[in-house]
Design a protein with these regions (language model features):
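Charge-rich (acidic/polar
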Residues: 22-208
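Bacterial Sec-dependent N-terminal signal peptides
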Residues: 1-27
Length: 208
């Protein structure tokens, strides 16, 4: 129950961000079939797009769907790995050409949120079981690893053309999140997933 109280605020935050972006311009997309509108919504549910952006995306999806249909037909009804990878790269390039940096980050945060959430819970549960951590420290670890995992995935996508810079930024984000655990919980999570205790947990430190 205590863990649930820690998770609920994050769920409301994620829900509020998602609701803020879930806007489909039905007038701008009126000429497109429902299947294409749905594919546009799969992007617009995470990143708020203008009507013009949605139309541009719809046109790109229309072309992608034609490529998809041709690829499946050419391979006897199957989509081979090479064609799938080509389509995925095409979609990523399309999004990068239509969305600005902030929109791309919003989109990929939405895409990878559940995966990052699972990673945060996995690490926190593992360390709590191993070290008999308090629920407060479970929360600090869970949030830090969730944020680190989420931002790492987003950075690798939006900085795909600069992998060295991306990895440097990821290292900075991870270090920042690990420091948050130390500052709030008085413990350090080491790279080998062991814990070093720095001080006793002080709830008053949370309010400084």
């Amino acid at each position: 129950m205590t863990k649930l109280r820690h998770i609920i605020p994050l769920l409301f935050l994620a829900l509020s961000l998602a609701c803020a972006a879930q806007t489909l311009d039905t007038d701008a997309l009126a000429e497109y079939p429902a299947a294409i509108q749905r594919q546009v919504f799969e992007v617009a549910q995470y990143a708020k797009l203008t009507g013009e952006q949605q139309r541009t995306l719809a046109e790109a999806i229309k072309k992608e769907n034609k490529i998809f249909a041709d690829a499946v037909k050419a391979n006897g009804g199957a989509l081979i790995v090479k064609s799938r990878n080509k389509l995925n790269k095409s979609r990523e390039a399309t999004l990068a050409s239509i969305l600005d940096r902030e929109q791309l980050e919003q989109y990929y945060r939405g895409v990878y949120d559940a995966e990052a959430d699972a990673e945060g819970n996995r690490v926190a549960d593992m360390l709590q079981k191993k070290y008999n951590l308090t629920d407060q420290n479970w929360k600090f670890i869970r949030v830090a690893f969730y944020k680190a995992a989420l931002e790492s995935k987003v950075i690798r996508k939006v900085m795909a053309d600069s992998p060295k810079k991306a990895e440097k930024r990821i290292a900075e984000v991870r270090a920042e999140q690990m420091r948050s655990i130390e500052e709030k919980g008085g413990l350090r999570v080491n790279p080998d997933m062991t814990i070093t205790w720095l001080r006793e947990f002080d709830p008053n430190k949370l309010h400084r």
